[in-house]
């Protein structure tokens, strides 16, 4: 069984199966799993910035970019397995950027919604969400 068919068969969720379609051509390029992880982090930070702007268009674009970033998070591990590039650093980097991505999203949404009916509580909830995302990293790496 080819590596690609095995990836597709082992994919548990629909987004992982869909990701295989993108991973196959990407795996034939020089891009590394850690580069993909870094790209997803940059996209998530940009999405957080858009969330922080708070207007409807920015919130919508921020949401779309964040979904794309999280979808692309499937790519790095798959490419690492295909290219036999799995490392402890890559595993740590992937999980850390995932936690940071969610923290930035919560902070951005909280800041962006401070002028809504939530007012001050939007920021409090954003900070609470960010702290919980980062706390999960602490639990994972114990």
Set out the residue ranges of the language-model regions.
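A feature for the membrane-embedded catalytic helix bundles of lipid/isoprenoid biosynthetic enzymes
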Residues: 1-23, 95-142
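Topogenic membrane-insertion module of multi-pass membrane proteins
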Residues: 1-61
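Juxtamembrane/transmembrane-helix boundary motifs in multi-pass membrane proteins
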Residues: 28, 53-57, 86, 90, ...
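Residue-level recognition of pore/gate-forming positions within transmembrane alpha-helices
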Residues: 41-44, 70, 130
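Juxtamembrane membrane-interface segments at transmembrane alpha-helix termini
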Residues: 52-54, 73-81, 134-142
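Acidic (Asp/Glu-rich) catalytic motifs at the cytosolic membrane interface
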Residues: 57-110
């Amino acid at each position: 069984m080819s590596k690609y068919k095995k990836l597709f068969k082992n994919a548990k969720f629909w987004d992982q199966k869909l990701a295989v379609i993108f991973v196959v051509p990407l795996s034939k390029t020089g891009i590394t799993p850690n580069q993909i992880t870094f790209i997803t982090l940059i996209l998530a930070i940009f999405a957080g910035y858009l969330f922080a702007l708070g207007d409807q268009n920015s919130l919508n674009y921020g949401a779309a970019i964040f979904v794309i970033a999280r979808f692309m998070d499937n790519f790095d591990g798959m490419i690492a397995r295909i290219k036999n590039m799995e490392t402890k650093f890559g595993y740590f980097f992937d999980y850390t950027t995932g936690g940071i991505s969610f923290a930035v999203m919560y902070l951005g949404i909280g800041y962006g919604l401070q002028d809504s009916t939530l007012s001050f509580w939007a920021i409090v909830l954003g900070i609470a969400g960010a702290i919980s995302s980062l706390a999960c990293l602490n639990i994972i790496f114990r």
